[in-house]
Design a protein with these regions (language model features):
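N-terminal intrinsically disordered, cationic/polar leader segments
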Residues: 1-52, 56, 67-89
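Acidic, glycine-enriched active-site microenvironments
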Residues: 61
Length: 89
């Protein structure tokens, strides 16, 4: 492998993947601006889809995560669900 591919491989971890999904969910919840439009917009359908995807990953990876990865995923899901519920009420 080239040095560039090795560096990229080291950057791609389960935690960085989960954090990227978290960022996407925060954009859909209107917490962060859309990177294309630079505007904050709420899209509850996409937010729920992203939260459901994270929940599915939690179930599918159960028993295979490090303690830190598991805590990160639990924390992210908790925070996203709270924000989602506040918006739908």
């Amino acid at each position: 492998m080239s040095k560039e591919k090795d560096e990229l491989k080291n950057l791609i971890t389960f935690s960085t993947f989960i954090l990227s999904l978290n960022t996407a969910a925060l954009v859909h919840l209107g917490e962060l601006p859309d990177p294309v439009t630079n505007k904050k917009q709420v899209n509850l359908t996409l937010a729920k889809h992203t939260i459901d995807t994270l929940e599915m990953l939690k179930e599918k990876t159960k028993g295979n995560l490090t303690f830190e990865e598991e805590k990160l995923l639990q924390s992210i899901l908790y925070e996203l669900k709270l924000k989602y519920v506040k918006l739908i009420d």
